[in-house]
Amino acid sequence: AAERLTPAEREPAVQQYVLLVTGLRALVGRDREPALILDSYLLRSLAVAGWSPSFGDCAQCGAPGPHRAFSVVAGGMVCSSCRPPAAAAPSAATITLLGALLAGDWEAAEAIGQRERREASGLIAAFLQWHLERTLRSLPLVDRSETTDRILAEDQEPDAWMGR
């Protein structure tokens, strides 16, 4: 799937590379919740590839937001006139989180609750898979549970995870 986010085969994708390295460093540093890092990376990678979702103005007609509907097909938030029947209606906090993740506003992103984080992750996954034109079989396997986050936050050794 990563190859679909780069411009052409065998052509360097410096921005994608820098974004990946930055994301991996953030994961290693454990300063942020891993699920937020992943979602931010996915949104930014899509933006670098030219598929940046709109979280403010209508993605279809450009009408100023905020708007209440999110359409994967349209490219983000849509006004009531452009809203297709299958559009999602995320909470205002979820929309704020999506914008914060795209912009790298970690303070705003970390202030949003778990329910909205799960909702945002689902929208990001749908948006990513739409633009890649394929299902990412590994994406549902990413463990976003609070237990994993707690273990990482406590910086326990692998032996502690095994109960040794």
Question: Language-model segments: what does each one mean?
Answer:
Residues 1-164:
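Non-catalytic alpha-helical scaffolds and adjoining flexible linkers that form interface surfaces
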